[in-house]
Each structure stands twice: as C-alpha cells, then as structure tokens.
C-alpha cells in the first residue's frame, strides 16, 4: 500500500525552525516582541485597528464573550454546524446558545435565520466563515446594528479569506485560529482583531490575569515592576515561540493558499462527473481560502454512506475529516435542547466528509484521492 495520506499536515520548513531558534536564543520565550510583530502583521493583513494574540481561538472567544458581559439570562445566536468550543464557552458563562440552521449548500448561517432567532435576550451573534469561504457579513452586521447586538465573527477558517475585496476582519470583531490544521499554524494559537478600542483594552487585560500590563510591557515601557489586577482574568497569552512560527507562516500565506486553491480546483473538476456533492460557493464576491474541501455523501445518490466511504478511503490509505457533527445532536446539547430541529444542518451533518487538503499535497496525491472516489462511486 502507498504511504498513508493524512487529511491534513502542517507545512513546516527550515524557516519555522530558524524562527524558533531565534526566539530560544533571545532569552525571551513567552509573550514579547514576536507577539507584538504578529499583532501588527494581522492589523496590516485585515486593515483593522487592534489585534490581540491569544493561546487559542477558543480562548479568544471566551474573553470576547466575557468582555461583552455575556452571562446568565443572555442568548447568543450561532449555527449548530460549528466546532463545539463556541457553544461550550457560551454555556460556561451561563448564557444560552441559540442554534440556527444554515444554507443547505453553502453551510453558511443566513441573515434570515439570524434575524428570526432574535429575542429581547439576544446579546451577540456569532456567524461562522465556513471552510474558508465568507458568510454574508455585511448583511449580518447590518442586523446587529439595527438591533444593537454585538457581532463576533468566527474566522477560525478564514486566514486569507476575502469578502467584497476586503480581508475578513477588516472591521468589527473577528477571531482567527492557528491550530495545527489551519491555513497558517503555530500548533496552537489564535488572534482577535477589533476596531473597538475599549474592547481591545479589556481583551488585553482578560488574556493576562486581569493585569493592566504584562512583563514585556514593563520591560519595554519602563512601567512599575509590579502590575496591578484591574479585573479577574485568565492565562491566555501566546508565547513568542508560537508567535514566531505564526509570523513565518503568515509570510508564506499567499503561497500556501495558492496551493490549496490548486488542489481544490483539481477536486472540483473531477467531482463534476461523480455523485459526491461539493459545497456551493457563496454568491457574493469573495476569495476562498480553501481551509477545507467538503463533499456530501448521500447514500441514495452515491450508493455508499458517508461513514462507509470514510472507512473505505482509510483502507486505501487516505485520511478524511468530519467538519462538523452538528452540536445540537451531541449528548449534552441534545439533552438540553431535545426538541430542536435544524433540517439543513442535520442533513449535512450526516453526509459531510472533508477530503485531504494541505499545501504539501502533490498533484499525484490529489489524483489518488480522485481515483479512490471514482472506484467507490462504481466508475
């Protein structure tokens, strides 16, 4: 059998090793100059005013919800077809996640679904830029402005995603992820961008014990050696080791995403003749970052179930992923919301399969996946 082809593999090289070596030799391992440089680079990438690096996108979501004073009695609108950390953070703060359905073919939450879910208790809306494509954020933001509700963009899949000519996160508040499978990675990490100066100040405190400054601030600006707690906070800062890797990856972003796009185009051309259904692209002008390439495997249409397809690909040495199992079908949320029905989400959650997609894949690797799909479709 050929070497196992994983669903994803980080694109690491000598540049990342050199960046880590530089940090180790500098003596400043935790939050410091590399964090500062990463934050500045994301302001340049997105065009937003403030950037706050954190230990994960989940951490970023947690402190953003906290800074917005979301808690018991509040509701937060979010799709169910998302990673469970968003729902978990809402729930841990005592608020209620209000899960809404998505478009059947783009898997994006729609402005109409969001607006129909608003109540007097709605405190925030969290749209997801899914799989590397953008949600219709202008329309969603307009709803937030009309009702006076905060919008927090889940941009975990959207480093390199553009909407109507502007990078995701160009205005408002958005949260990016640098997890190991993301378009750029530093193993674990995340970053928040915002145009709200007061929110940015609160996020910086909350990510570091509620202190007004961190150790690098004190060294750089000569502030008092003992910082003071201004509000209870967390230990969510990013180390400079991670930030240095993320910076190096960010410098390669155009190259990395171009390769993802080439593989996605190869898949799209082949799937035109197969029963497996890729996602539809959004109707609005955009640049897709191709974080994921997803097909829907309908047993009646394809002659094989999604789970059987994934197992058959595994037997052929090909890895796949599932993004995502709907949150409201998982034990805790199923028991908490037993009557919730989201038809489009449920239909897709039972059929979606993420194919291998990462920059170091070769054309031959993609051909191998396509050949396996052709065989499993009986062609």
Swiss-Prot record:
Molecular-function annotations in GO: pyridoxal phosphate binding; UDP-4-amino-4-deoxy-L-arabinose aminotransferase
Catalytic activity of the protein: UDP-4-amino-4-deoxy-beta-L-arabinose + 2-oxoglutarate = UDP-beta-L-threo-pentopyranos-4-ulose + L-glutamate
Pathway the protein takes part in: Nucleotide-sugar biosynthesis; UDP-4-deoxy-4-formamido-beta-L-arabinose biosynthesis; UDP-4-deoxy-4-formamido-beta-L-arabinose from UDP-alpha-D-glucuronate: step 2/3; Bacterial outer membrane biogenesis; lipopolysaccharide biosynthesis
Keywords recorded for this protein, A-Z: Aminotransferase, Antibiotic resistance, Lipid A biosynthesis, Lipid biosynthesis, Lipid metabolism, Lipopolysaccharide biosynthesis, Pyridoxal phosphate, Transferase
Obligatory cofactor(s): pyridoxal 5'-phosphate
GO cellular component, one term: membrane
CDD domains for the chain: AHBA_syn (cd00616)
Listed Pfam families: DegT_DnrJ_EryC1 (PF01041)
EC number(s) on file: 2.6.1.87
Residue numbers bearing the N6-(pyridoxal phosphate)lysine modification: 182
GO biological process: lipid A biosynthetic process; lipopolysaccharide biosynthetic process; response to antibiotic
Cystine connections: none
Top enzyme class: transferase
Its biological purpose: Catalyzes the conversion of UDP-4-keto-arabinose (UDP-Ara4O) to UDP-4-amino-4-deoxy-L-arabinose (UDP-L-Ara4N). The modified arabinose is attached to lipid A and is required for resistance to polymyxin and cationic antimicrobial peptides.
PANTHER family: TRANSAMINASE, UDP-4-AMINO-4-DEOXY-L-ARABINOSE--OXOGLUTARATE AMINOTRANSFERASE
Subunit record text: Homodimer.
Family: Belongs to the DegT/DnrJ/EryC1 family. ArnB subfamily.
Protein name: UDP-4-amino-4-deoxy-L-arabinose--oxoglutarate aminotransferase
Organism: Escherichia coli O8 (strain IAI1)
Gene: arnB
